[in-house]
């Protein structure tokens, strides 16, 4: 049997197990192990009608099972222990430090004042703010969790549909899967053995385009269904420009990371991990200057640890 056929059957089996209620991690692990065993059984042409004696059957079974267990035990460990994965907790820390230092709130406020006047303006502002936050966080869960606290109450306050508000935040959170420094792309780069920096950079344009598409869909829905997302007006040009300075720190971090890791004018100044470490230090210093308390720092570290453990 062709490996791709085995893969399709195993994927179908995993989907069936998930639909039957098994946890995704266990379903994926079991399906993967069965797929590896099946591959080696088929590779060495272990057909039942060719095996005459019981000891031959046992030898064949133990051989395929042994190879499957060996790979299942070594490959995940080798992938998870890759040094480049250390950038994931670093960028998650950047995101939570920015949140507890109120940088993300300032970013959302700036987006609200500039884009709130369009139909579904708060939802559009949420999408653009999540895109900006994704550029320093890299984790969809962190992005969705942060803006669920910031944006949903604001949208509900002006009469947004609850399901619509939650859907906007959930959709905005997915931008962190594309916009660098995406944790998903880091893991994918390790699996397919590609350069992490190059793959992260490749996600920037699709991520930015997705944000624009989301914004367009939101505006269209708000125009067709008037009560879904009413516009928010009343901001003067002075108020709009006044909202920019508080949002500059998080924008500055994004620019620094781009030039440090991806430098469009020459060679990169460092690796993504080094860029993340410098970004975390900069955000930490900014947070201290903005008056971050020990309790807030502790919460940022705990939330970073919890999300990192969940990802790994």
Please provide the spans of the model-predicted regions.
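Alpha-helical transmembrane segments of multi-pass membrane transport proteins
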Residues: 1-312
